[in-house]
From Swiss-Prot:
Pathway: Metabolic intermediate biosynthesis; chorismate biosynthesis; chorismate from D-erythrose 4-phosphate and phosphoenolpyruvate: step 7/7. This is Chorismate synthase. Coiled coil: none annotated. It comes from Burkholderia mallei (strain ATCC 23344). Keywords: Amino-acid biosynthesis, Aromatic amino acid biosynthesis, FAD, Flavoprotein, FMN, Lyase, NADP. It catalyses: 5-O-(1-carboxyvinyl)-3-phosphoshikimate = chorismate + phosphate. Its cofactor is FMNH2. The lineage of its organism: Bacteria, Pseudomonadati, Pseudomonadota, Betaproteobacteria, Burkholderiales. FMN binds at residues 125-127, 238-239, 278, 293-297, 319. Transmembrane segments: none annotated. GO terms for molecular function: chorismate synthase activity; FMN binding. This reaction introduces a second double bond into the aromatic ring system. Its EC number is 4.2.3.5.
Amino acid sequence: MSGNTLGTLFTVTTFGESHGPAIGCVIDGCPPGMALTEADVQLELDRRKPGTSRHVTQRQEPDQVEILSGVFEGVTTGAPIALLIRNTDQRSKDYGNIAETFRPGHADYTYWQKYGVRDYRGGGRSSARLTAPVVGAGAIAKKWLRERFGVEVRGYMSALGEIEIPFVDWSHVRENPFFAPNADIVPQLEDYMDALRKDGDSIGARIDVVASGVPVGWGEPLFDRLDADIAHAMMGINAVKGVEIGAGFASVAQRGSVHGDELTPDGFVGNHAGGVLGGISTGQDITVSIAIKPTSSIRTPRRSITRAGEPAVVETFGRHDPCVGIRATPIAESMLALVLIDHALRHRAQCGDVSSATPRIAARAPDAQ
């Protein structure tokens, strides 16, 4: 399994399985001299951890992070940073009934066909549990980006199933378990999830992520374009089946006279490009949306096959998220931050001394509609 590392200069390699003794990651390339404590990382992990509301898995994992290396006297040294998160609430017996059967919609069948061996306990390596160390690494990336460039990476749930969630204010996001930017709609979301759980079914979600303050110039054409790497990272999140940058698929129905973001001396007039042109950041907000599929682990009986190829019926029991999108916001934020810090370092390495006589215009013109 050779695809466990993300990044070029700032790299993150994750390890562990859902029901193993621990999960974690090794971060290489973090700049030295940044103040860092376990509490800095824990703040982000607490936003993602399970068991925080009745609408998510009731697996009770404290997700307490340990920094094993790369930090001395509270400061990063430039050496690899190892983060460890111990698993404490595994219930492997819940998965005994699927040891010989493939769960529809999961990685069971493909992992078995590719590797010839499968850890069926909670999905093993393919579990969304492995997003915890990604969030830990993302906490470090977000801190460096904020302190070095003033970049803020924030996200929110913009749709739960067929329920669209109009954006009201960022302050609402941290006040509810859905990361919804609209407090008035939360009771409707709660009723929706309660009915879904009663039916033994699941649903998908859309998450929007915004990075503000990214300078113009980040991105490495042709094949490491900033938006290409963002899409690559977002598709590495469990259950993500679609990624949009800026207007995304809405661009199909837009005319060039609408979609093209005009430039004026006072700033850009629009941001349909989502903050990236030619694979390089424009200085505008980078806007990303991801589509998350419904959880495959549901109580409704589903047809499948056994390892011997015989027909079978699968009913999934245990502790599962009826919508994995509810906890996906900090994960998507972390992925975007990891791509941005990597490109910040790559830009500094090759083009740090480049200057242009053309003034850098504002992210948005004052009179832009």
